[in-house]
Structure formats: structure tokens, C-alpha cells
Swiss-Prot record:
This is Homeodomain-interacting protein kinase 4. Disulfide bonds: none annotated. Its EC number is 2.7.11.1. Keywords: ATP-binding, Cytoplasm, Kinase, Nucleotide-binding, Phosphoprotein, Serine/threonine-protein kinase, Transferase. It comes from Homo sapiens (Human).
Length: 616
């Protein structure tokens, strides 16, 4: 067991939790407090010098946040020696991907997805107040704090790829964001803002429900193709402005086509790039609305006499899909902001409370909601939006909800649901219509689609039933998600964020709708009037570091220079008022810290699932 020492503390390394291209994460025992911590260890060389500056700069900007209320990881301290950098964080339990893996990727109930979504949206809203884009939101970077004591309480981690609005004027290709969660503006080369994180969260929500990534593209063409086949083509003005549009689209040869652009076919892409497109989706959705039909989600709507509990759960799932649709839009300015999303009926439970307050499902949802927000030693208090004082969520009126005591011990917080067998579609063309998202991808003319309008009429003439909600999505992928539970998810080639800045893309400024104070009476009015908090002024700095995710341990750099803390922008590490106590934040809530033991660190400490596992 090795030992490392900072100026103020000493750490015993218990075990290495994981290794990545950037370095490794170890579990350590902090002698001064007796608590277990996570230590991020990177080589001290010129390449990582700049990278570490970026992460430290972002952590410094976040030092005023309460990690418990903002749902971000607590940073303790930074130090270095002649060979390595060390960043010390609180130790958390496991990330959402590992939690899914432990539960055999069973679909997560909508009530638990809401609990996670609420907290991540709160984190994004707080980051936006500091003008910070996380830029790498995914299940691996959302950590469960303590699933036993605080079910589905989560924190956002890994700010190595984060950026500050005022400093990141350009983005380099390849890429920010992990591919499965990459926003359209990054894929197409359009101006972007903090709403790239909202897109990523929408993909995470869908993945928690599906048990499989919504858009698991093997490359950027597949990623764009999947989005087009589910959500339709982007509007022409977006493709006209996109500097990467020609990679995935071509001009439509049909003069009477509704869209002057069409998606390149798989054969076109193969001929141009020698890369064969792959099909990696589990569910081939023809619209985002079909998300609610997966994993038995539409059962309640099909029952002749559904009970109240089934109706409540179905209504909640439908509301969740409506929010996902607002988060997954081609155009970023049409995408819901974090603050407005916190007012959405799915997150606030407004609709569920008004129509299903007496159901057991509502009581379970409310209890899960509360426990995730409970900070030890504090009552759950509503978080207030900075711009207008409107609560993001309001629990005061439900404090006397009936039956909460009995609910506490009657049901587990995670109900492991095995996905029912999907009813395969016999004919993919049964429900084609002009409104179908996937229509027109390959440049069909308007006349080619007119006959599709006759499908309901033909069905009525022949006596066939036309389902109101559309068919279930086609089940496309049959094998296990991991092809063996002992295997870790490996990142496909080119899926990681890259820091070799080239092919610059201009960064858009703060979203126009976020510039005005919110005075709306409803969550929708609040969004249109600017529900997002205006970013605080951030000191301009001269350097912006590249992403931390793509550091290569084997990369050799000529004349490596050692890191000098005083060289950080703003010289905050050397300021007398920026001590360990000023950046460590409040003490971790939960189990009381253990004091130093005479015979070394205690055993049986909570395990920490590395937040640096590979990207999709």
C-alpha cells in the first residue's frame, strides 16, 4: 500500500479503481479525517499540464457552489510532485451505467428517471449560472451517492471536458461530447451553447427507460442517420448553415421535393469513406413518441378497464416522453432550457398530482423524490430560480401526504422489471404517413408519399384496425447489451472527446430566450419569457484547456515541462485566500467521517466506480 502526501494531508492508496487513457483513479484513505476519497492521478508532462489547468480552472469557478444542493461532486484538493498530478474528490458509490449493468439493464421506472432528471437539471441550471458547459454528460458521469441510504440521489462528475462560455469561442474537431450523447449542433458543425447538455440528458433519460442507448451510432454518419430516421430531417436553413452538412447530406435531385437536402444513403457513405454503416440500435423508432410503447409502456392504454395505478404510471411515462421530445430537438433555440425543464409537469409532478394524487404510484413517486433531495441534517427545501424566485419544485404542499409511513417499507425503490417480449412488426410500412418522421430521408418527392395518406382509408374499407397510437417500434438488435456481463462497455473507435483542436467551429452566445427575466405564470410561459438564469460574469482568461478525456498514457511529448501551479490562469492556486478549505466545499453528508485508525484504513468501505471509464 503506497502513500502520497500533500502539503496539508496524507493519503494511503487502497486500490486502483480504474484506468483510462488519461491516467487512473484510486481509492484512498485520508488520514486527517479517516474518510475514503477518490484520487484522480495523471502524469506530469507538458501535454497534461494544459489539460489539468482547464479542469482546475473549472473547479475553481465552481468553488462557490454547495455540492449537496447543486448535485455536483465535491472537490477536496489538488497537489503534485515531480512525476504526477493528484486531484482529490469525495468517494461516491457507482455510476448509472454500472447500476444499469447490475440490474441486467432492466428499464428504470419513470418515477426514478424523474428523480435523476430533477437533480441533473438542477446541476445544469447551477452550471449555467456560472456560464459553464459540462460537454460530456452521459450515464458514466452521473454518480449515485449512496443507493441504500439515499436512493437515486446523484451527482454530476468529471469536469475535464467542461468549458466556460466566454472563453470557448471555437470548438475543434474531432469532437466534444461522447458520440451517443452528442448534440446535432456538434455533429453538423453549428454554433452551440449550454443546451448541448440538455440534449445529452434527454438521451440519458431515454436510455434509462429503454435499457439501451437511444442513438448508439458507430460513427457520426450512423449517429446522424439514426436521428433522422426517428426525428426526420433537419430544416433546410440548418443544413445551409452547417459546415459539416456535406459529410452526411447531399442536394436533393428532385426539384419538387419538400426539402432541398437528402440524407446520403449507406451505399453513398461506404463509397466515399470505405466505412460500412452498422445497425446497433435495439429499437428502431419511427418517432420519439414510440418510446412510451417500449417495455410495456402502452399496456395501460390497451386495457379495457385499466386500474388507477396503471393509468397513473402510463400518464407519468407519457409526460416523460413529452419532456424528452422538448429536449431532443434539431435546433438548439427550440430546445428547452434547464430552468424551464425543471418546471415541466413531468419534473414538477404537477400533472401527476392533479390527476392521480390518491394513487399508490404517486405516493411512491413523491417519497423517492424527497429522499433523493434530502441532505442529512437539513429538511428538503425547494431550490429557487435565480431569476424570479419561482421554485423549481415544490414539496411543502405535499408534506402531509397520506400513507407515507406505510409506503416506506412496502416497496423497493428500484423495481427490477424484465422487458417483456417485443411484438415484432410484420410489415414496416403498415403505418407510414406524411407525418412520419423518417419520411423523405432519401429524397422522395411529394407525389411518392401521397398514397400513404390513403392507408387509414384503405384499412377502414377492408375492415382492418388502425391503431391510434401507432405501431410498436421494430426490435432490431437481439443480442445482450454487453455480450457477457463480465465485459465492460468499450468505446467504439472515434467516440471520445478529442482535444486536438482543428477545424474550428464558432460558438454561439447565450440563448436569446434566456436573456430576459422570467415572469410567466406557467412553466411554458416561463420558458418563453426566459426561464434560464442569466450567466454570471466570468473573469476572462487567456487559455482554454482541451478536453481531459482523450489523454493518452503512452503519448510521448518532447521536452516535457513540469507543472507550475502559479502558471494557472488567475494564479488562484497561489492566492493566499484560496486554500484547501476554500475549494473543498462543505463536508460530505451521510456517514460520519471515520477518524484515523492505528492499524491503517478501515475495511469494507463503500466502493467507487470510476468516473473515467471509456466513452461510448
Amino acid at each position: 500500500m503506497s502513500t502520497i502526501q500533500s502539503e496539508t494531508d496524507c493519503y494511503d492508496i487502497i486500490e486502483v479503481l480504474g484506468k483510462g487513457t488519461f491516467g487512473e483513479v484510486a481509492k484512498g484513505w485520508r488520514r486527517s479525517t479517516g474518510e475514503m476519497v477518490a484520487i484522480k492521478i495523471l502524469k506530469n508532462d507538458a501535454y497534461r499540464n494544459r489539460i489539468i489547468k482547464n479542469e482546475l480552472k473549472l473547479l475553481h469557478c465552481m468553488r462557490g457552489l454547495d455540492p449537496e444542493e447543486a448535485h455536483v461532486i465535491r472537490f477536496l484538493e489538488f497537489f503534485h510532485d515531480a512525476l504526477k498530478f493528484y486531484l482529490v474528490f469525495e468517494l461516491l458509490e457507482q455510476n448509472l451505467f454500472e447500476f444499469q449493468k447490475e440490474n441486467n439493464f432492466a428499464p428504470l421506472p419513470a418515477r426514478h428517471i424523474r428523480t435523476v432528471t430533477l437533480q441533473v437539471l438542477t446541476a445544469l441550471a447551477r452550471l449555467k449560472e456560472l456560464a459553464i458547459i459540462h460537454a460530456d454528460l452521459k450515464p458514466e458521469n452521473i454518480m449515485l451517492v449512496d443507493q441504500t441510504r439515499c436512493p437515486f440521489r446523484v451527482k454530476v462528475i468529471d469536469f475535464g471536458s467542461a468549458s466556460i462560455f466566454s472563453e470557448v469561442r471555437y470548438v475543434k474537431e474531432p469532437y466534444i461530447q461522447s458520440r451517443f450523447y452528442r448534440a446535432p449542433e456538434i455533429l453538423l458543425g453549428l454554433p452551440f451553447c449550454e443546451k448541448v447538455d440538455v440534449w445529452s440528458l434527454g438521451c440519458v433519460m431515454a436510455e434509462l427507460h429503454l435499457g439501451w442507448p437511444l442513438y448508439p451510432g458507430n460513427n457520426e454518419y450512423d449517429q446522424v442517420r439514426y436521428i433522422c430516421e426517428t426525428q426526420g430531417l433537419p430544416k433546410p436553413h440548418l443544413l445551409h448553415a452547417a459546415c459539416k452538412a456535406h459529410h452526411f447530406f447531399k442536394r436533393n435531385p428532385h426539384p419538387d421535393a419538400a426539402n432541398p437536402w437528402q440524407l446520403k444513403s449507406s451505399a453513398d457513405y461506404l463509397a466515399e469513406t470505405k466505412v460500412r454503416p452498422l445497425e446497433r440500435r435495439k429499437y428502431m423508432l419511427k418517432s420519439l413518441d414510440q418510446i412510451e410503447t417500449v417495455n410495456g409502456g402502452s399496456v395501460a392504454s390497451r386495457l379495457t378497464f385499466p386500474d388507477r395505478e396503471a393509468l397513473a404510471e402510463h400518464a407519468d411515462l407519457k409526460s416523460m416522453v413529452e419532456l424528452i421530445k422538448r429536449m431532443l430537438t434539431w435546433e438548439s433555440h427550440e430546445r428547452i432550457s434547464p430552468s424551464a425543464a425543471l418546471r415541466h409537469p413531468f419534473v414538477s409532478m404537477q400533472q401527476l398530482r392533479s390527476a392521480h394524487e390518491t394513487t399508490h404510484y404517486y405516493q411512491l413517486s413523491l417519497r423517492s423524490y424527497r429522499l433523493s433531495l434530502q441532505v442529512e441534517g437539513k429538511p428538503p427545501t425547494p431550490v429557487v430560480a435565480a431569476e424570479d424566485g419561482t421554485p423549481y419544485y415544490c414539496l411543502a404542499e405535499e408534506k402531509e401526504a397520506a400513507g407515507m409511513g406505510s409506503v416506506a417499507g412496502s416497496s423497493p425503490f428500484f423495481r427490477e422489471e424484465k422487458a417483456p417480449g417485443m411484438q415484432r412488426a410484420i410489415d414496416q410500412l403498415d403505418d407510414l404517413s406524411l407525418q412520419e418522421a423518417g419520411h423523405g430521408l432519401w429524397g422522395e418527392t411529394c407525389t411518392n408519399a401521397v398514397s400513404d395518406m390513403m392507408v387509414p382509408l384503405k384499412a377502414a374499407i377492408t375492415g382492418h384496425h388502425v391503431p391510434d397510437s401507432g405501431p410498436e417500434p421494430i426490435l432490431a438488435f437481439y443480442s445482450s447489451r454487453l455480450a457477457g456481463r463480465h465485459k465492460a462497455r468499450k468505446p467504439p473507435a472515434g467516440s471520445k472527446s478529442d482535444s486536438n483542436f482543428s477545424n474550428l467551429i464558432r460558438l454561439s452566445q447565450v440563448s436569446p430566450e434566456d436573456d430576459r427575466p422570467c415572469r410567466g405564470s406557467s412553466w411554458e410561459e416561463g420558458e418563453h419569457l426566459g426561464a434560464s438564469a442569466e450567466p454570471l460574469a466570468i473573469l476572462q482568461r487567456d487559455e482554454d484547456g482541451p478536453n481531459i478525456d482523450n489523454m493518452t498514457m503512452e503519448a510521448e511529448r518532447p521536452d516535457p515541462e513540469l507543472f507550475d501551479p502559479s502558471s494557472c490562469p488567475g494564479e488562484w492556486l497561489s492566492e493566499p485566500d484560496c486554500t484547501l478549505e476554500s475549494v473543498r466545499g462543505p463536508r460530505a453528508q451521510g456517514l460520519p467521517p471515520r477518524r484515523s485508525h492505528q492499524h491503517g484504513p478501515p475495511r469494507g468501505a463503500t466502493s467507487f466506480l470510476q468516473h473515467v471509464t471509456g466513452h461510448h
